[in-house]
């Protein structure tokens, strides 16, 4: 059995290509095959990291209600991440970057002493055994170009927390006509299926 943590972050609801790819993937797994934890970060947005929450993460001794709730939520999200075998992130590109909704999740799980630590040798990720797949959808073509601020950032922050086994599924040119869009979405479906099948096989053998 594989433990999935799936994150959606599109603001487009039922019209979202990235969310549909995740839905199609998860629908292939029965309760006997996978434990699935799923968050729609746009439909149920997380709190934005602000000064109060940041101070609570540094000095949790005296907290107000807002800080206490934020830390409890952060602990819960981190527990889900640590327990996962596979993290699947659906990340549509907005203005060359990830959605704000996804950034809010990152800000709550990237915590010193919880998912990374500072050592004499430099930062060290504390998460082990979690693999990640980034599913990115774009209207144009940005793969391996300077306009892609999205994938490099996600890889950096995941590596920082100790998640280094990362695959990326690209669905690009989705605004360049329906035929092109469907062709690229179908390629993304196949690639996503291959990656998850490989990871499921490795997990069952471990």
UniProtKB/Swiss-Prot annotation:
The UniProt function text for this chain reads: Quinone reductase that provides resistance to thiol-specific stress caused by electrophilic quinones. Also exhibits azoreductase activity. Catalyzes the reductive cleavage of the azo bond in aromatic azo compounds to the corresponding amines.
How would you classify this enzyme at the top EC level?
Answer: oxidoreductase
**What protein am I looking at?**
FMN-dependent NADH:quinone oxidoreductase
Provide the residue positions that the database annotates as binding FMN.
Answer: 10, 16-18, 93-96, 137-140
Which co-factors does it depend on?
FMN
Keywords for this protein: Flavoprotein, FMN, NAD, Oxidoreductase
Q: Which InterPro entries does the entry link to? A: Flavodoxin_fold, Flavoprotein-like_sf, FMN-dep_NADH:Q_OxRdtase_AzoR1, NADH:quinone_OxRdtase_FMN_depd
Q: Which GO terms describe its molecular function?
A: electron transfer activity; FMN binding; oxidoreductase activity, acting on NAD(P)H as acceptor; oxidoreductase activity, acting on NAD(P)H, quinone or similar compound as acceptor
Cite the EC number.
1.6.5.-, 1.7.1.17
Reactions the enzyme catalyzes: 2 a quinone + NADH + H(+) = 2 a 1,4-benzosemiquinone + NAD(+); N,N-dimethyl-1,4-phenylenediamine + anthranilate + 2 NAD(+) = 2-(4-dimethylaminophenyl)diazenylbenzoate + 2 NADH + 2 H(+)
Determine if Oxidoreductase is one of this entry's keywords: yes
Q: Which Pfam families match?
A: Flavodoxin_2 (PF02525)
Q: How is the cofactor bound?
A: Binds 1 FMN per subunit.
Record text on subunit structure and interactions: Homodimer.
Report the sequence similarity comment from the record: Belongs to the azoreductase type 1 family.
Please name the gene that encodes this protein: azoR
Species source reads Psychromonas ingrahamii (strain DSM 17664 / CCUG 51855 / 37)
């Amino acid at each position: 059995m594989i433990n999935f943590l799936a994150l959606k972050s599109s603001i487009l609801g039922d019209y979202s290509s990235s969310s549909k790819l995740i839905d199609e993937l998860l629908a292939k797994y029965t309760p006997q095959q996978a434990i699935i934890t799923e968050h729609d970060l746009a439909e149920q947005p997380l709190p934005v990291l602000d000064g109060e929450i940041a101070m609570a993460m540094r000095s949790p001794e005296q907290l107000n209600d807002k800080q206490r709730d934020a830390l409890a939520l952060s602990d819960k999200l981190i527990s889900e991440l640590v327990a996962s075998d596979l993290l699947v992130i659906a990340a549509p590109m907005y203005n060359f970057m990830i959605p704000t909704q996804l950034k809010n999740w990152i800000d709550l799980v990237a915590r010193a002493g919880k998912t990374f630590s500072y050592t004499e040798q430099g930062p060290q990720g504390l998460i082990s055994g979690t693999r990640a797949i980034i599913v990115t959808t774009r209207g144009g073509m940005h793969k391996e170009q300077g306009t892609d601020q999205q994938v490099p950032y996600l890889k950096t922050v995941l590596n920082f927390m100790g998640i280094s086994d990362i695959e990326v599924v690209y669905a690009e040119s989705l605004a360049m006509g329906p035929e092109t869009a469907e062709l690229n979405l179908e390629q993304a479906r196949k690639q996503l299926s291959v990656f998850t099948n490989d990871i499921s096989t490795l997990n069952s053998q471990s």
